[in-house]
């Protein structure tokens, strides 16, 4: 990755990787050059002495006065020969197996020591003298590799290389562990798992528990690790440490059980966790049976610490390897009898050829120590792919392990073969993804990934084999492990064994069974009835010229409707016999592939050849016989200007682009004439290429000089893509590097390479271009090639001249051109076995029902082979779309049982139907209909009528229906014959939102060197929202200034947030192609048609489609507050973004699910007398709110940004049921809860019956009464007091005040209509006052005499009087009851007369006056004067 800002380092991800992750030193242990036998001399020239010195070592002396370097000696011991001699001698003496092993190992150590002592003595003597002078120190002699490590001055180094016994001197390079991408975190470490579920998935997957059940858990064996150390007292490891002393459990015996090459600590420890995790996978489990993390829990472990945080130096690793070969006591004496059975090596160097440790590995093998090496992991500098496997794992003598995941798929970080020795690598695979094991702190941690995690599984299974048979040799163990592995294949590696999985997944049970019970083999063919009636067809461009002494690679493309089973090439030289060779398929498959065969060692004057193509049905098609003119080898005087077809020039290799013709790019014109040979005449060369262009064979003159001269134009990525000229000496297999080319030439240049050193030899010369995974340029062009005996004065020195230095800063690890090796075509394996007539081949899984072990038949032939523990079993053959079949087999040790299967195709059924919108009933166009249980069935798509149809094999299925803008739906179906199913999808109604975490301003931009990497931002939906639809993304890119020239292509992906520690988890959508705007504006990527539903948290991801500088630069907000939501995707791994990068400028456009609106006003069951009403409520912001009155839409409005809405509508008379829905372009929500509003414009009917208007009273209270009538009556109030209403009447008792009282009766209904009645009543609580009442004195009256009765009082009173007779008068009661009126003679003056009659006789009769007013007040008063009637005085 690089940034726009030139003076800044690339992101800390790069530096993190360099410091602590997966770095492989590019110049570690450069191999010695191959020198032609004809030019070897006993005397050393100045040039040959300088060639002994590593260029990187020379550079280190420019920085330091002294440095540590390694001295490698020419003399090599032959430990294998010594071991064989020791075994032979032991057998003659009839020694026991244990004594034989001891003598064998001792002989190995002795042979190494003797060779080292003899060859090193003079140099050691010199170094010790320099030590005395202060010019050298830290001298350490090794025998496991014949070498010395010393810390000394440049002068000492230059003297050392002059010793003839010294082969070369090298820097003390650092090697790296293949660390997990999930480094140890004490806080996340896990506690013990109970024994009931204590076997880890990875241990179980390789059938280790089944091996334990047979009694093989590694007991009696010892495994070693060269790593970061081990926490010896970890509960899963403590009692398994060979130094553990049960009598003194806390004080182990560390001598010869532990060695610290880094810090010299006496007791085992692990400061980096890696070694503890690795050892746990080999042997770990707790005494109580919990935490069964190890494959060989009965084995013992020993360990060497050779790695620190910065890696392990060559000197420390040599010391470790020597100790493993024969652990040393306190005095430094080796003890081969204490050597382990297996050594695990989860470390390595870079890819390619580096043989520094090969002698060490050979020594281990000779001593019967099984050398397991992890294949290595991808990193920023090693992208993986073919040939990437690290050293020493890529040695032929190393047993390399690749990594798989829980699904037995190759881990994307696992490096691949072939090896530089053209061997399949790795040998085997084992689980290496999300591995749980022991870590320091006496706890456990899962989530560790890497081939480091895979290797210990294989080391432990090797220990199980040693327990089963301690006499097994390393070769035998390798054969058992590979032959019992479960073959694994995929689309990249369709055949087994292959350069991804090797021979497959290691299987502990089968491996042990092979030793104890032996293996049987079932083989046969899986087929389906049918005939292959079409013969194969082919294409071949004939060759007309070849050159004597060379070879002729020929290619042919063959095609067949069923299967091409073999392609053979027959040739003859002159009149000789025909020779037949089998061509290798180098690309394609059994239906159509390209095949290559190479005719070796061409002689004579004429070559004839023909092809034979065989297909599955037995057809054989033969080509014509092609005649080739054989020309003598070219030599001095040869010229080739490429204007005519260049005979004898052969192009081949990986991603080969070499072609002959007229260039339209690069130099655009030839150096002379019109035509050239170039790497793609119309564009850039391929990435990850290793392409060869070989000249005709050359015969170097026996004397004189020979120079290769040619015109060259090249534009190659600085420091990463190189052009080479290689020379293959006569009789050699390894090509020598003669010229190196890098960078860009400004025009055609003259190049010259001196071939004079190859006098008298038949040699070959190759032009080779090698590229990494990114940044391809215009390439290399060759013209006007000449072989001359005279120099043109432009000789290119090997690895020196011809290299054009790059400008600018290095952004990724440069390629070391010294390690380059030309490509060799790798054949694609395919079987050619006898076939059955009248059948067609079928790829099927063949399984052992009782154990589950399985393999696959070859797609081109139907043939399969399955090795298994001997016994009686049931084999099952099953293939997609076919009825499975079984048959009983009896597998016998070392015998082959035939079992053929002919399968019958299953019947198919048809599912059809219509998908509609659940809300509207309209058809849904573009809905996808999936068969969940059968991903091979292509999803059906609905047409514009919503109709779909799909075909699948009969059976029970779950059908999922999904469409953009809708919620998906599922249903179950029993598919048999034709089935029809209708589906209604609920629309997803959303409103737009934008999620952003940057501040909108871009301060920088980034671009990855390699395509396929990316950046992501974690998005979180708004509060209260748990679901949404992703409708688009906003991406901000830099302008055309960066990168230059740049590009616009990129991809968009979407991940959920279920990854470990918050990382992106599962990809839920994408990749989608997009085009970047490079003008400072945001680039909007429309995803609305994709139907991407997201949960609360999700990731929007930018994936770079093109390598830098042909990609856009994603902008970075470096000044805004860091959101902590930034992640980067590098080499298939997610990791948190570099905080220094700030916030990645990626935003998400989402539709939040539109909520069903809520009407807040008017309230339910409300009444109004208004014709219209304002409906208010809440809805999702920006949605259109539709208000309905009954079934009819009454109004429409848009919800505001805060979600509120309001709209006026017209009401109907009577009851109105109001609802609201919200809509977007995608559809409409459900209706809100109904609100009932009644429009009532009629007033209540009301009477006021009591009191009558104008009434008078003297009462303090009054009951007001009347009648009322209304359907929606709310209340009746009298003077504001709520009246009692019943049966159409109302009443209310009120208080009155003295004086005039107005009584108001109001009848109100629920709609607010009112009827009012009023009345007035006069109230007087005061009684009239009587004054001046006469007679004031007693009066004597006789019959006929009158008395005047008078008084004063208020006006308009009703005045009366009565004469109250004494009670003694019998008739008094009658008289007393009579009231006689008084007349108001003047306002307020009342008078009256009473005349005595003769009939009344009374003494003391009283006169009482009574006044009454209109209010009902009454006053009585008795006059002071009494009446004596008809009495005597």
Swiss-Prot record:
The keyword DNA repair is assigned to this record: no
Q: Which residues form the Inhibitor I9 domain?
A: 68-177
Basic residues biased stretches: 808-821
The enzyme's E.C. designation: 3.4.21.-
Note the PANTHER family from the entry.
CELL WALL-ASSOCIATED PROTEASE, SUBTILISIN-RELATED
Family to which the UniProt record says this protein belongs? Belongs to the peptidase S8 family.
What is this protein's record name?
A: Bacillopeptidase F
This protein's species is Bacillus subtilis (strain 168)
